[in-house]
From Swiss-Prot:
GO CC annotation terms, alphabetical: chloroplast; small ribosomal subunit
Pfam families from the UniProt entry: Ribosomal_S4, S4
Complexes and interactors: Part of the 30S ribosomal subunit. Contacts protein S5. The interaction surface between S4 and S5 is involved in control of translational fidelity.
The protein's name in its UniProt record: Small ribosomal subunit protein uS4c
Species of the source: Marchantia romanica (Liverwort)
Length: 202
C-alpha cells in the first residue's frame, strides 16, 4: 500500500491529531460525530486498525515499511511496540521534523528527496535512513537550501525539541543525542494495539 496523498483534514477528523501529517487541528462542525466515538459498538479489530492507521499516517510510512518495523522489533530484546515506535521515530524524515527543520514529516521527506539534508557531512536522500546516536544533521550549503530551512525554522520555533535531540538554530545543526524513550514519542498512541493488529502477519 502506498503513502496517503489525499485530504489530510479528513484523516485527522477520523483519527485525531497527527502532528507529523499536518499541524492543522480542524474545528468540528456542530452536530458532527466522530465515527470512532459514536454510540455504535466498535469491534476490537477496528480499534486496532485505527491505531495502526494513526501510526502510518503520522509518520507517512507505507504498510510494508510498518510491517517490516514490527517484524524487526519482534526479533529484538524489549517491548515490541516500543521498538517499533523507535524505528519510526529514528527515521531521518522524522528527525528533521522533530528538530523543527520542516513543519511536517511530508515536508521533511521532500527536503531529503531534494538533497537539502546532510548526515555527518554527507548528503542523504533516503527519508527512511535510520539515524543513530551522535549523528549530526546539517543543511546543504546552498542559498536555496538555507533559505528554505531558515523559513521553516522561524515557523516552528514555538515547538519544543524533544530531549533526545539538540538543535543549534544559529548554525542550523541538529544532533541525535540518544535513542528516544517512550515519553518522548510525539504521538498519542497505544502501540500494543498495533502489535496485536499485526500478530497474524508479523
Amino acid at each position: 500500500m502506498s503513502r496517503y496523498r489525499g485530504p489530510r483534514v479528513k484523516i485527522i477528523r477520523r483519527l485525531g491529531a497527527l502532528p507529523g501529517l499536518t499541524n492543522k487541528i480542524p474545528q468540528l462542525k456542530s452536530g458532527y460525530t466522530n465515527q470512532s466515538v459514536s454510540n455504535k459498538k466498535i469491534s476490537q479489530y477496528r480499534i486496532r486498525l485505527e491505531e495502526k492507521q494513526k501510526l502510518r499516517f503520522h509518520y507517512g510510512i507505507t504498510e510494508r515499511q510498518l510491517l517490516k518495523y514490527v517484524r524487526i522489533a519482534r526479533g529484538a530484546k524489549g517491548s515490541t511496540g516500543q521498538i517499533s515506535l523507535q524505528s519510526s521515530e529514528m527515521r531521518l524524515d522524522n528527525i528533521i521534523f522533530r528538530l523543527g527543520i520542516a513543519p511536517t514529516i511530508p515536508g521533511a521527506r521532500q527536503l531529503v528527496n531534494h538533497r537539502h539534508i546532510l548526515v555527518n557531512n554527507n548528503i542523504v536522500n533516503i527519508p527512511s535512513y535510520r539515524c543513530k546516536p551522535q549523528d549530526f544533521i546539517t543543511i546543504k550549503n546552498s542559498q536555496k537550501s538555507q533559505t528554505i530551512i531558515t523559513k521553516n525554522i522561524e515557523l516552528s520555533q514555538k515547538y519544543q525539541i524533544p530531549n533526545h535531540l539538540t538543535f543549534n538554530s544559529l548554525e542550523k545543526k541538529g544532533l541525535v543525542n540518544q535513542i528516544l524513550d517512550r515519553e518522548s514519542i510525539g504521538l498519542k498512541i497505544n502501540e500494543l494495539l498495533v502489535v496485536e493488529y499485526y500478530s497474524r502477519q508479523a
